Amino acid sequence: MNSLRPELLELTPQALTALSNAGFVKRSLKELENGNVPEISHENDALIATFSDGVRTQLANGQALKEAQCSCGANGMCRHRVMLVLSYQRLCATTQSTEKEEEWDPAIWLEELATLPDATRKRAQALVAKGITIELFCAPGEIPSARLPMSDVRFYSRSSIRFARCDCIEGTLCEHVVLAVQAFVEAKAQQAEFNHLIWQMRSEHVTSSDDPFASEEGNACRQYVQQLSQTLWLGGISQPLIHYEAAFNRALQAAETCNWRWVSESLRQLRASVDAFHARASHYNAGECLHQLAALNSRLNCAQEMARRDSIGEVPPVPWRTVVGSGIAGEAKLDHLRLVSLGMRCWQDIEHYGLRIWFTDPDTGSILHLSRSWPRSEQENSPAATRRLFSFQAGALAGGQIVSQAAKRSADGELLLATRNRLSSVVPLSPDAWQMLSAPLRQPGIVALREYLRQRPPACIRPLNQVDNLFILPVAECISLGWDSSRQTLDAQVISGEGEDNVLTLSLPASASAPYAVERMAALLQQTDDPVCLVSGFVSFVEGQLTLEPRVMMTKTRAWALDAETTPVAPLPSASVLPVPSTAHQLLIRCQALLIQLLHNGWRYQEQSAIGQA
């Protein structure tokens, strides 16, 4: 029996959840525990499960789970298909010993992939011609996976390609699966054993000696970006928009002509920050704007260096096409999505107010966001957290899990849902939902997070398809809590994870668009009957401290989306809990403040004073 369908033995509950849904898996496990075990047989290379109520499910050799035939009459996936796999696994576990895991060889699938429709293979080769790069993960004991610029592929079975899942609209046996297999085969030929690798696909159109700025378009893009940077530094972003509007447009048009997605997205992010500054938006962050401008120029400089190393036969840490995002599509259609909320941020400016909710797909680990805005005149009667999105209140979405059909994802990670694409269900967020998530999103503690941040590449070469400073951390104990009225910020220090120096700083600034968020945070950290055990939020360095700005706080019974709080909670404890920065950090803080001052007001108008302060 074990040799008949070995690929089914590899399907973990997590894999079955990804191939069907969590409800089917939970119900199937419960029914099996209650004794509703089907009779397993096989005939003509097909595995058959016969249930006590007469339902008969048949899974032929070479079929995917959703292709199985079932007499229950359900369209698509059903619990009987899941129970067939689980029952078969239990039967094999009792009749045969577990064989030692063999080394994975994806090359066995090349012959089968060659029989796919011509259209699928042509789409795959078109992506190869653009010089696509694929991030490969193949750690022992973990599911092999491939992260493409706009799709994620996971190989839930090392024996059958039919159980590979992609989060694109096709779901399986698509061009992304083809490319993932090809990348693994090529990478293993060069380096037999690896846990993590970035692999660039090459064709006759992509040579190792090409230069991103050798073409007229590439050189023009670099020049226009440099001109924009010089304009902003000399005049400052506080100057009227008309002074740099043309420079932004020239640089953006040049980046789009080159089809360098991360360069164009960098320009859009920078422009959004500049617009937020002029609109006096609550979510404007001066340090982030400074970082965006610096990273924009650094991205092009890094691309030049990666190309230079490649041209002399040296393997670059990251291919230059990955640095600039060459050939990445602006949108991608997604398959059936199950999303878990990571939190919400409300904002307002002089004309609009709105919100952004972040979700993660537990099957792939990718992060998406949903954004909406409305005229400021409607805010008093309809606060952002109470607005309805697709018939559900925003606060419920921020503290829940959702299922969506036929969605799209933009290049910057935005979840695009048309009005007709209703969310089919929303259930409250639970600690179990977050426990299913893995690294790097969910970290075991602040010590592990520091190490991860030290080892990852610089921001100027990382892709911009999703936020990469959003994490989930454990909370064991709150050791100090206080409201700093001078900074209008609630600070706390908590124990997070094991090891030395495991104190995590939580800081949440007050916001007029979410006035009771700080009160809810203070109340949660002080309660003892249902203490906070997990927290999600954005990580940054504040006055030399690795600091997390909380978005959701999870107790043992429920999740609290802080910005969804719409009523007063409790008074704030007044205290200063943050340590005094060291002399070195104080100098760095002054340096950053001076750079921000120059960025706001321009070098041209404060050259002498800036030199004196420096």
From Swiss-Prot:
InterPro entries: Znf_SWIM
ZnF (SWIM-type) intervals: 55-89, 151-185
Entries under Pfam families matching the protein: SWIM
GO molecular function: zinc ion binding
Record-level GO cellular component terms: cytosol
The gene coding this protein: yehQ
Highest taxon of the lineage: Bacteria
Keyword annotations from UniProtKB, A to Z: Metal-binding, Repeat, Zinc, Zinc-finger
Keyword Lipid biosynthesis: no
Note: Missing up to 60 C-terminal residues compared to orthologs.
Stated name of the protein: Protein YehQ
